[in-house]
Regions:
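DnaQ-like (DEDDh/DEDDy) 3′-5′ exonuclease domain used for proofreading
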Residues: 2-443, 570, 576-593, 600-645, ...
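Common nucleic-acid-contacting/processivity interface regions adjacent to the catalytic cores
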Residues: 2-9, 202-206, 551-688, 694, ...
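Core structural elements
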Residues: 45-55, 123-126, 131-133, 138-139, ...
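Conserved catalytic core of nucleic-acid polymerases
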Residues: 167, 175-195, 666-669, 675-680, ...
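Active-site-proximal helix-loop-helix substrate-binding element of RNase H-like nuclease domains
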Residues: 402-409, 414-430, 443, 447, ...
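Short glycine-rich phosphate-binding loop at a beta-alpha junction
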Residues: 445-452, 867-870
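Short active-site loop/helix that positions an aromatic residue
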Residues: 456-466, 667-681, 903
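HINT superfamily self-processing domains
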Residues: 873-1006
């Protein structure tokens, strides 16, 4: 295979350059970057923007000249000041900032130290650009379009940005309140320039980068002013280079590989010996611990202490005295372990332990083993960790699942592999550095793998440290040639993934994706093992190689190691193929651009930053400012009270094929609820003084919700809260409502663009838009400009799809991003850690949603004399009784004879449904509780939901995990809630006396 990166043509700086942004890097945010020791070394704010052109040429662009800023609302008493008095107070404040000190608190190791600090450090005067007065509106609460005087603090560096932020935070008690200091300056730059953070930009005025500190491995390295970067509309994605990697490791004991070994395994083995009843003394301890450096210490036929592998030659004359010194402590721990019985319930209740002193939980036993491990690790020689034996890498380019390059780096020899580069190394140190060099040559835009945030990257980092090559391995691992990357350990809590600890390399210019985390976030699966994911989504089951087989084959021949290599490359390629199949790049690029955050954020950050950036942009456009609200500050008096969530109507079970079924579905219920009642922070009346009676321009709507306290069975209603929201008579909406309207409208328009046709006239001119036939003419409507064009058919040369399949995929991903973002906005308003958290709006949204559902139900039942019911799918092997031409049959759905055709309109928004098909039988009727009913259509589709089999006295039913069942009281329960003995509600037929007998086959036919 040819190497995927080619030499780029020489840069012509006189020509415009266009590229798609892939990543953002802020040097001042880099904790590994050397801190300036003097003011002269301190740089002004820089942004590095990485991207790729339409020809696959990589670009690094340093953007200079942008000045970060935030706002401060002065004490309320200042609002009453005249302009002259306000100006005087401002001058006094500026003098204080420029000349004075303030008291700071330094916290370390749980201790606080107070000290005085100069507000603007000596020599950094130029980093403070200005402190001025501006007029803005407050996002937090309805103020009837009132402008307030705010202090705008503008700086030239991130260091000064944080300095001023800390200073004004110390002035909270004086009444100063910060606004938007929690918005990263580069996000604000994105907002101001109307740039899509993963979109296309054009730069006309630039020069080649000449600062070695910013030299990268990109094809073009350029420098420009922040005003020269402009957004452009390009409806495709650049040919991004996507690399996937996987590591294979050895294990000295045949168990799970450990990168840095201590004596935990020895401690566990000693615990087993202790529990077997063996007595310990100092000599026995010394014998065991000295033997394990040569061979297993065999205690009995089934009990041994495994051999260990020290880094260096063991000098027993040194370690023996250390063992004897600590022998008493070791014996004490082992004696305690030998006298316990383990309580598998892991019950830590103090009373129970006191009543049964010999009982110990698994957790408590692990603590004892950990103490023993600490002693052994302290006195005994350091051990070798389990080595990385192979690193596989595969590459594909966006737009195709074809693997354009394969590489395997192997410890020791490895046979050649067709269409793959095989590199054999004599040491693990060489192996790691070879892979680092490969990354430099490949220069991927995207680096992916499976569980790399949970295993691979941390393992590689530890092995680099153990081999004493961490600096060489990490330097230039990203795109900057001189920058040293680091392993980031990040704790992330989100609704999609729960609590997680991510461990990854902070690679500048390279977007790192752990496919496992994406699958866990976006899909519900029985198992998230790679082979199961591959089988579900691409129908390809990988050739598995068990861990013990890997360990055995590595010790074998070059051919054996080639088997491991093929397995490793296979895993890498599966990741590439799944990324392509599930359109992960399209979906996440669309989401990044909708929410105005970098692509990297979607894989390493929670939901909050996405929505916050979007809201901040809309606030900026409408001259509103968002206060910095920490949870303790924004808690209202009733905040600890709960509120009622969504409503679920009880289903009326049955198969409804005789009468037509009409589905009533709100288009995005919660967003629609918020739009309908203008539920937005800037329209929520918090201060009655702004609610003007008989205002000619504004009406006011009261929305109430029930307050609850307690949970579960103890939950009870404790009151009702009424909230007032401003309603503009001219149809204007609040900021949140406006955002939702925009998102839903853009989604609708984006979906329509997928249907665009290009009509080319005979004179070669062309028109794009939604095409409809009007007799002898075509009518073309263009969504962007609203123009309608009519063209006679006789003047038309051709009619073709405007967009190709790749472009349609981008639009499809974009419309999905609009939908998800609209639904996520409500969630962030109700999330206590969110910068826009406001419980009253979240509660009013759910209250309105419940009202809308009940309103629709009552309307249908009152005006159309209809029933509101629910339905669910059944498994294909479910038997049904049906008839055709007066002949009765009992058969399963999967055995129905007929022509199955694609049915894409069924549940289009359900990501868990694949390959939808329909079958429309002719003159077929099915038996229902209402008699014989004609079958309109039968629909079948794959699902990735769990299937539960529920057995009852009447038979069994197989249902999906979210299927609604009714308990004996008629309440809805899910299959997961069913236990043995749970009573379900049955619908039994009416029995009547009848003396005629039928045979078994007839009985089966009649059900």
């Amino acid at each position: 295979m040819d190497f995927p990166r080619k030499d780029a043509p020489t840069l012509d700086s006189s020509k415009e350059i266009q590229f798609q942004i892939t990543d953002w890097y802020i040097p001042e945010n880099d904790r590994n970057r050397k801190k300036p020791e003097t003011p002269e070394e301190a740089e002004f704010y820089n942004m590095i923007v990485y991207g790729t052109t339409n020809n696959g040429i990589t670009v690094s662009m340093r953007v200079t000249g942008y000045e970060p800023y935030f706002y401060v609302k002065p004490p309320e008493s200042w609002e009453k000041y005249s302009d002259k008095k306000f100006s005087s107070e401002m001058q006094s404040l500026i003098r204080v900032i420029e000349e004075d000190k303030y008291q700071c608190v330094f916290k370390r190791d749980g201790k606080s130290t107070q000290y005085w600090k100069k507000i603007v450090p000596n020599g950094y005067d130029e980093h403070l650009r200005s402190v001025t007065v501006v007029k803005k509106k407050d996002f937090w609460g309805f103020t009837n379009n009132t402008d307030f005087r705010f202090i705008k603090v503008t700086v030239r560096s991130l260091m000064m940005f944080n300095t001023m932020r800390y200073y004004f935070d110390s002035r909270k008690t004086d009444g100063f309140k910060m606004y938007e200091s929690n918005i990263d300056p580069f996000l604000r730059y994105i907002h101001e320039q109307n740039i899509k953070p993963c979109g296309w930009v054009s730069v006309t005025e630039y020069k080649e980068e000449d600062n070695d500190d910013y030299s990268t491995r990109c094809d073009y390295n350029i420098l420009t002013d922040h005003k020269n970067v402009n957004p452009i509309v390009v409806n495709n994605i650049a040919p991004l280079l996507v690399a996937s990697f996987d590591i294979e490791c050895m294990s000295s004991h045949g168990d799970f590989p450990v990168a840095k070994k201590d004596y935990r395994k020895v401690a566990q083995d000693l615990a087993i010996v202790a529990k077997a009843g063996y007595n310990f003394d100092a000599d026995f301890i010394s014998y065991c611990l000295e033997t394990i450096y040569k061979a297993d210490a065999q205690i009995d036929d089934g009990i041994k202490i495994h051999k260990v592998y020290p880094k260096n030659t063991v000098d027993f004359s040194i370690i023996r005295p250390k063992i004897m010194t600590e022998a008493d402590k070791i014996i004490e721990i082992l004696d305690e372990i030998s006298n316990i019985t383990v309580d598998d319930n892991d019950n830590d209740d103090d009373d129970e332990v006191a009543a049964a002193p010999k009982s110990m939980t698994v957790k408590q036993q692990n603590i004892l083993e950990s103490k023993l491990n600490s002693i052994l690790t302290k006195i005994l020689p350091p051990l070798k960790g389990d080595e990385i034996i192979q690193i596989g890498t595969t590459v594909h380019k966006y737009g195709s699942e074809e693997i354009v390059y394969k590489n395997i780096i192997s410890l020791n020899s490895c046979d050649a592999i067709k269409d793959a580069d095989v590199i054999s190394c004599k040491s693990e140190k060489q192996l790691l550095l070879e892979w680092r060099n490969l990354m430099g040559r490949l220069n991927p835009d995207i680096l992916s793998g499976y569980n790399i945030f949970g295993f691979d990257m941390e393992y590689m980092w530890i092995r680099a440290v153990e081999n004493k090559i961490a600096d060489d391995f990490l330097k230039g691992l990203g795109r900057n040639l001189t920058r040293k990357s680091d392993l980031i350990v990040q704790k992330l809590s989100s609704s999609a993934l729960g609590d997680n600890e991510l461990k990854y390399f902070d690679l500048d210019g390279i977007v790192v994706i752990d496919l496992l985390k994406v699958m866990q976030r976006d899909h519900k699966l029985d198992s998230y093992k790679l082979d199961n994911v591959a089988q579900v989504f691409i129908g390809d089951k990988k050739d598995d190689l068990k861990p013990h087989e890997i360990f055995k084959k590595f010790k074998g021949s070059s051919s054996d190691r080639c088997t491991i290599a093929n397995y490793c490359i296979q895993d890498c390629a599966l990741v590439n193929r799944i990324l392509h199949k599930l359109k992960i790049m399209e979906n996440n690029i669309g989401m990044a651009n909708v929410c105005l955050v970098p692509l990297n954020y979607l894989f390493k950050r929670g939901q909050g930053i996405k929505i916050f950036s979007l809201v901040a942009k809309q606030c900026m456009d409408r001259n509103h400012l968002i206060p910095v609200n920490k949870y303790a500050d924004m808690r209202l008096e009733s905040d600890m009270d709960g509120y009622e969530g969504a409503v679920v109507l009880e289903p009326k079970e049955g198969i409804y094929l005789d009468d037509p079924i009409v589905v009533f579905d709100y288009g995005s219920l919660y967003p629609s609820s918020m739009i309908a009642r203008n539920l937005s922070h800037d329209c929520y009346v918090m201060d009655k003084k702004y609610q003007v009676k008989d205002d000619p321009n504004i009406d006011y709507m009261t929305v109430s919700y029930d307050l609850y306290e307690g949970t579960g069975d103890k939950k009870k209603k404790v009151g009702v809260k009424e909230c007032v929201f401003a309603q503009y008579k001219d149809g204007r909406k609040g900021i949140i409502s406006d955002i939702l309207c925009m998102l839903l409208a853009e989604r609708k328009n984006t979906r329509k663009k997928m249907e665009y046709k290009t009509i080319t006239r005979n004179n070669k001119s062309a028109v794009n838009g939604i095409v409809s036939e009007k007799g002898s003419s075509y009518e073309i409507f263009n969504i962007e400009n609203g123009n309608t064009t009519t063209i006679p058919k006789k003047d038309v040369a051709s009619v073709k799809d405007t967009y190709n399949n790749f472009e349609k995929d981008v639009f499809d991903a974009l419309q999905l991003a609009y939908k998800i973002t609209a639904n996520s906005l409500y969630g962030q308003i109700g999330a206590r850690t969110s910068p826009i958290y406001l419980k009253d709006i979240a509660a009013c949204t759910t209250a309105t949603g419940r009202e809308m559902i009940m309103l629709a139900k009552d309307f249908v039942e009152t005006n159309y004399n209809a029933e509101v019911i629910y339905g669910d799918s059944v498994m294909p092997y479910t038997p049904i009784t049906y008839r055709t031409s007066d002949q009765l049959y009992v058969n399963t759905f999967e055995k129905l004879e007929g022509q199955w055709t694609a049915y894409e309109k069924f549940k289009q928004s359900d990501a868990n449904i694949y390959n939808k098909e329909q079958f429309q039988p002719i003159n077929m009727e099915v038996w229902t509780h209402r008699g014989w009913s004609k079958i309109a259509r039968v629909i079948r589709h794959k699902t990735v939901k769990k299937i539960y089999r529920v057995y009852t006295e009447s038979g069994c039913v197989d249902v999906t995990e979210d299927h609604s069942l009714l308990d004996i009281t008629g309440n809805i329960i899910k299959p997961v809630d069913c236990m043995i003995g749970t009573s379900l509600l049955h619908s039994r037929p009416q029995y009547c006396a009848y003396d005629k007998k039928i045979d078994i086959n007839q009985a089966y036919i009649y059900g």
